[in-house]
């Protein structure tokens, strides 16, 4: 059977049962639970340091009213980083390469920020649709443009995450296939291709973390507009 490069993005099944829910829940089993010991393990200490550092970075754009949403934003970021990193392992499925999964994350969070703004300060929330000092003839066009821009935000969040991870996985598979094919024909070129594959994998590790950070950073900026 001939396999396509895009087969890696198909949702895994077992006896016809989709396993995407299991893939989404797996990252949580990898995090050590807090213990009652006075001295934590190295893994738990590293996890605490990582979470504290990222919490400080994520709360910088938010005012005091938005700090109560910090744990939720941090939870989304850790969840995305875990899934993205696990997806780089061989023979694994990456749920965040599915637009449906990313939209399921982006739409409720975006809708939450809009509802918060409309409940707390509806005048300011609706005021974002019309910049101050707009000439009267341009008011209808600008309201339409800003409304479209508002509703495109969750789509941009989901598509950005999907496109970047999908492109990286395809490049890794293409270069790995080239190295495998070239190995018996041109070993020297195959070795150079393997080195390139290793460097690209390191780049993908950075992309996996950066895309998760960008997702929650944009989310925090949207939240800042409405709190």
UniProtKB/Swiss-Prot annotation:
One of its GO terms (cellular component) is proton-transporting ATP synthase complex. Gene3D superfamilies: ATP synthase, F0 complex, subunit A. The keyword Glycosyltransferase does not apply. It comes from the Eukaryota. Its main location: mitochondrion. The chain crosses the membrane at residues 14-34, 69-89, 98-118, 132-152, 180-200, 202-222. InterPro entries: ATP_synth_F0_asu, ATP_synth_F0_asu_AS, ATP_synth_F0_asu_bact/mt, F0_ATP_A_sf. It catalyses: H(+)(in) = H(+)(out). One of its GO terms (biological process) is proton transmembrane transport. GO terms for molecular function: proton channel activity; proton-transporting ATP synthase activity, rotational mechanism. Disulfide bonds: none annotated. It is found in: Mitochondrion inner membrane. Keywords: ATP synthesis, CF(0), Hydrogen ion transport, Ion transport, Membrane, Mitochondrion, Mitochondrion inner membrane, Transmembrane, Transmembrane helix, Transport. Component of the ATP synthase complex composed at least of ATP5F1A/subunit alpha, ATP5F1B/subunit beta, ATP5MC1/subunit c (homooctomer), MT-ATP6/subunit a, MT-ATP8/subunit 8, ATP5ME/subunit e, ATP5MF/subunit f, ATP5MG/subunit g, ATP5MK/subunit k, ATP5MJ/subunit j, ATP5F1C/subunit gamma, ATP5F1D/subunit delta, ATP5F1E/subunit epsilon, ATP5PF/subunit F6, ATP5PB/subunit b, ATP5PD/subunit d, ATP5PO/subunit OSCP. Belongs to the ATPase A chain family. Subunit a, of the mitochondrial membrane ATP synthase complex (F(1)F(0) ATP synthase or Complex V) that produces ATP from ADP in the presence of a proton gradient across the membrane which is generated by electron transport complexes of the respiratory chain. ATP synthase complex consist of a soluble F(1) head domain - the catalytic core - and a membrane F(1) domain - the membrane proton channel. These two domains are linked by a central stalk rotating inside the F(1) region and a stationary peripheral stalk. This is ATP synthase F(0) complex subunit a. It comes from Tetraodon nigroviridis. The lineage of its organism: Eukaryota, Metazoa, Chordata, Craniata, Vertebrata.
């Amino acid at each position: 059977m001939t396999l396509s490069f895009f087969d890696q993005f198909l949702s895994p099944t077992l006896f016809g049962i989709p396993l995407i829910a299991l893939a989404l829940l797996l990252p949580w089993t990898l995090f050590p639970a807090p213990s009652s010991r006075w001295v934590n393990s190295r893994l738990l200490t590293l996890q605490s340091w990582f979470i504290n550092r990222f919490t400080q970075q994520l709360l910088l754009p938010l005012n005091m009213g938005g700090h109560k949403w910090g744990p939720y934003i941090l939870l989304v970021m850790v969840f995305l980083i875990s899934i993205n990193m696990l997806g780089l392992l061989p023979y694994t499925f990456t749920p965040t390469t599915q637009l449906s999964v990313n939209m399921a994350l982006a739409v409720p969070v975006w809708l939450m920020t809009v509802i918060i703004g409309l409940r707390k300060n509806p005048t300011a929330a609706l005021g974002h649709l019309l910049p101050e000092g707009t000439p009267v003839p341009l008011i209808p066009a600008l309201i339409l443009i800003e409304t479209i821009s508002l509703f495109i935000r969750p789509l941009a969040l989901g598509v950005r995450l999907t496109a970047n991870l999908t492109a990286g996985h395809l490049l890794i598979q293409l270069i790995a296939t080239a190295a495998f094919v070239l190995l018996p024909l041109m070993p020297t070129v195959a070795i150079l291709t393997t080195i390139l594959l290793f460097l690209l994998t390191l780049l993908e590790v950075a992309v996996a973390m950066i895309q998760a950070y960008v997702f929650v950073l944009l989310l925090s900026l949207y939240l800042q507009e409405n709190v």
